[in-house]
Structure formats: structure tokens, C-alpha cells
């Protein structure tokens, strides 16, 4: 079913390009040529067996990992395996990359103070190094002084490296979500990172999984940042996942949010809630903007007990086309808990399915701002557990 969703996603993009002549470079990049079999024949899209044998696009997404680390800090690949007997029985092993800014020792004893940790989850057809390069999050971490953890989906688990956010078991916090929770705990202990300042962020399928991680483990995650995310809890299969991406949720927006709100309230008293920033482009044809609106509604329910102002603050920012840092026009809606922003929704004009303000030499990244990485870190830095 995971490969089914990936195939539907790619076929949707092919259909879009047939009907829209004014294509952006991003949308063109989403159209890999048909994979060829070892005998040189194109893999047949209509045959499920052929798709299993020839997962077309995955090899094309791998970029040179050196691009992600032209920085003075530490950038290393590691592998996480569960250590407890109960977890180890699953046999799950997950690769991850970790960036530690310069001056941060691998030994907790040598750190002047514990560093915050941002967990970054890539989207489909990306690797962890791709995502690090595209978002420029490591550069920001070097400037601001925080660690960045990039779990990576394996091509064996999904040919397009998509996270399976639409599966009910995942939505309940099992599978990859539990593996990541254990990974975060291990990485924080090993490197002496701040357990009260751990944040989850992601793009597209990675944003969907970051949402689940935050809502299922509010004792670990202090705040959430999502870019181009599907609404939470509305899918139960690959087919319905694709439908949600295109049309949003039918009826369960409030129901699943209410359940999540009650779970969080019991897991992290007296705070409750889950601080979150939601970023979406108004021309996203992969995960339609209705998802951002519905996810925002869910997060309002989840944060209802902590939001103290009846009215949200709304701001608009004009486009900037000249200078070294061009920006698209965008608007933001902010709900406050006291003086802290508790929930921010940012709608970016003319942006497609791409990380705003990133490295546009990479797939699913747009150079023009606003800078989504900086916006997320600015929001995260206001929140901590305890």
C-alpha cells in the first residue's frame, strides 16, 4: 500500500503537468522518467509486480552527502536499533544523521549548557542529507546553537522513502513513531542534549509524521513545526491518504483532535496543548491548502485550554522582489498563550510543494522566502517543557 500511495502521488503530478502549461521548475522535477529494467526495457506502470521489482524514482533522489555539511560542526551518520527486548523484537533499524554545531563536544560533560534538539523529518523522494541541504537547517543550527537530528526512511521500507503516516498503527504511535521516540531519548542521553527543549519538524509526509510524533509523545516534544502537512488522523490506508492530500478530511477533524487534546492534557500537566507553527503554500498541488486549514482547526482544539486571547492576531507581509533575499507575500495568524505564540498559521502566496526560503538547487525547496527554517526556530525558542 505504501508503494500504491507513492504511485498515486506521482501520477497525480503527471496529470497536473498535462493541464498546466505554466509549470514551475519544481513540478517538472517531480516527473522522473520511467525506470528501466536490467534488460533495458521500461518498467510497466500497470503491473503491480513490475512496480515492486523496479521502484523507479528512489535512486534518483540520492544526492552527494557532502553537500549537507560544509560547516565546522559535526555531521555524522549513525544507526539506531532498539535495545529493550520488547522493542528489539521488531527488528527495526533506522539510519539517522546528527548535526552538532562547532564547540559542542560529543561528551555531555564538556558542554557549557545542554543544547536544544530539532528533529527534522524529510518528505517523499528525499534523504536526510537532501533535507538538510534543502532546508539549510544545519547552517541555522551553527548560528543559533542547537543540534539537529534527521531520521531517514529506508528504501527497503518504501521505494520513494515516504513515511507511512496514513497507517492506523503509525497514527497510534507504533512502528516508526515509537522507534523515533526511542531514538530521540538515546541521542539526547548520549550527547547531553536538553530534554526540555526538543522540537519536531518536517515537510509533507515528514510533517505528517512529525505531527503524530508530537501528539503521541508530548512528554518528549516541546513544540511542533510542519510545512505542507496533511490533516491529522483522517486517513486509514494509502488510497484514503492520497484522497486526504487532495481534498482534506471529510468529517473527523474535531473528533481526532479532541482525543489528542485529552491525551496531551494527561501527559504534560499543567501545560497541556502542543505549541505549533503550520506553514503552507497556496499553490501546493500535492498536499492541497485545505489540509493546512483543517490541521489548524485541529491544533486550535488541542491548544484550546492554553490559548488565552479570544481573538487571533493577523498580519500580512508584502512580497519583496529585489535584493539578495527575495520574499513571497505571506500572511500569518497567531494565537497566544499569555505573551507566547501558541499556534501560528502561515500562508505563503504563490508557493507550491516546497520548503520556503531553502536551497532551490534541491528538490522540494524554493529559494524565495520567508525563511521557514528561521520561522520555526524563532517559534521553537519560545517553548520548553516543565
Regions flagged by a language model, labelled:
Residues 192-204:
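Alpha/beta-hydrolase fold nucleophile elbow
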Residues 207-219:
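Short glycine-enriched nucleophile-adjacent loop
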Residues 169-191, 212:
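Alpha/beta-hydrolase active-site loop
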Residues 104-115, 120-159, 234:
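Short substrate-entry loop that stabilizes the transition state in hydrolases
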Residues 1-117, 129-135, 201-205, 209, ...:
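A domain-start/cap signature at the N-terminus of enzymes
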Residues 152-175:
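Cap/lid segment of the alpha/beta-hydrolase catalytic domain
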Residues 220-234:
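A conserved short beta-strand
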Residues 278-280, 284:
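Short beta-strand/loop motif that positions the catalytic acidic residue
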Amino acid at each position: 500500500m505504501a508503494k500504491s500511495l507513492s504511485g498515486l502521488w506521482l501520477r497525480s503530478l503527471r496529470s497536473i503537468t498535462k493541464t498546466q502549461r505554466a509549470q514551475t521548475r519544481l513540478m517538472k522535477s517531480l516527473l522522473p522518467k520511467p525506470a528501466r529494467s536490467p534488460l533495458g526495457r521500461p518498467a510497466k506502470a500497470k503491473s503491480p509486480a513490475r512496480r515492486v521489482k523496479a521502484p523507479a524514482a528512489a535512486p534518483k533522489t540520492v544526492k552527494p552527502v557532502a553537500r549537507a555539511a560544509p560547516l565546522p560542526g559535526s555531521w555524522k551518520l549513525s544507526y539506531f536499533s532498539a535495545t529493550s527486548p520488547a522493542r528489539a523484537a521488531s527488528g527495526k533499524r533506522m539510519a539517522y544523521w546528527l548535526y552538532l554545531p562547532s564547540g559542542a563536544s560529543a561528551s555531555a560533560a564538556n558542554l557549557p549548557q545542554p543544547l536544544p534538539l530539532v528533529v527534522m523529518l524529510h518528505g517523499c523522494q528525499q534523504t536526510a542529507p537532501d533535507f538538510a541541504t534543502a532546508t539549510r537547517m544545519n547552517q541555522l543550527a551553527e548560528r543559533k546553537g542547537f543540534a539537529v537530528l534527521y531520521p531517514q526512511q529506508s528504501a527497503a521500507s518504501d521505494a520513494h522513502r515516504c513515511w507511512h503516516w496514513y497507517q492506523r498503527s503509525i497514527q497510534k504511535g507504533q512502528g516508526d513513531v515509537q522507534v523515533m521516540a526511542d531514538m530521540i531519548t538515546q541521542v539526547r542521553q548520549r550527547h547531553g542534549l536538553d530534554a526540555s527543549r526538543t522540537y519536531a519538524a518536517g515537510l509533507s509526509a515528514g510533517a505528517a509524521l512529525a505531527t503524530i510524533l508530537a501528539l503521541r509523545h508530548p512528554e518528549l516534544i516541546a513544540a511542533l513545526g510542519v510545512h505542507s502537512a496533511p490533516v491529522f488522523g483522517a486517513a486509514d490506508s494509502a488510497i484514503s491518504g492520497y484522497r486526504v492530500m487532495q481534498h482534506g478530511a471529510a468529517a473527523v477533524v474535531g473528533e481526532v483532535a479532541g482525543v489528542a487534546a485529552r491525551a496531551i492534557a494527561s501527559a504534560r500537566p499543567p501545560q497541556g496543548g502542543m505549541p505549533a507553527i503550520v506553514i503552507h503554500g497556496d499553490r501546493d498541488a500535492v498536499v492541497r491548502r485545505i489540509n493546512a486549514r483543517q490541521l489548524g482547526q485541529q491544533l486550535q482544539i488541542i491548544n484550546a485550554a492554553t490559548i488565552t486571547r479570544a481573538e487571533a492576531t493577523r498580519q500580512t507581509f508584502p512580497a519583496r522582489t529585489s535584493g539578495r533575499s527575495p520574499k513571497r507575500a505571506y500572511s500569518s495568524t497567531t494565537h497566544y498563550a499569555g505573551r507566547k505564540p501558541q499556534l501560528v498559521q502561515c500562508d505563503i502566496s504563490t508557493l507550491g510543494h516546497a520548503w520556503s526560503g531553502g536551497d532551490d538547487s534541491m528538490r522540494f525547496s524554493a529559494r524565495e522566502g520567508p525563511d521557514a527554517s528561521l520561522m520555526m526556530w524563532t517559534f521553537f525558542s519560545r517553548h520548553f517543557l516543565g
